[in-house]
Amino acid sequence: MNLKSIFENNDEKPLDNIPADGGYTAIFRTIACVGDSLSSGEFEADNGNGGSSYHDMFEYSWGQFMGRMCGSRVYNMSRGGMTAKEYCEGFADANGYWNPKYAAQCYIIALGVNDLLGQKQELGSPDDITAEDKKTFAHYYAEIIEKYKKIQPRSKFFLMAMPSEGEKDG
């Protein structure tokens, strides 16, 4: 990959040139995706009663596509409807995700839609990160990072921005 073609091109658009081999993502041999339905490859299906059912289809998640492209092992530590609070208060423990066997060189955390837009949880502030009594989104999000940093101190973290409520394409 020629970095000059990226950094010296003011008109460069990252999605116009996606390397078929995953590019520099391949430096990470293990990647963990912590998130909600946007991370779990969730499919919606007709339940036959006029409603919908939802199914996590990890094989179709963007994390697994990325893993196949770059040859990395990707752990899906996600579920449709997931919140940072639920992840910390039971989901991670129940699924063994704090277990060092899932230690990764890279963690991609994509939470917030269900927390802030769905459950209208208080966002919080940096002061909440270490406050035990202030259970805000910021507190739980930081707790996830802190626990994985203890499991794998040299890991890198990529925090995904979430879509805005009512955001339009274009």
Language model regions located:
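A generic local structural motif
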Residues: N17-A20, F91-G96, E143-I145
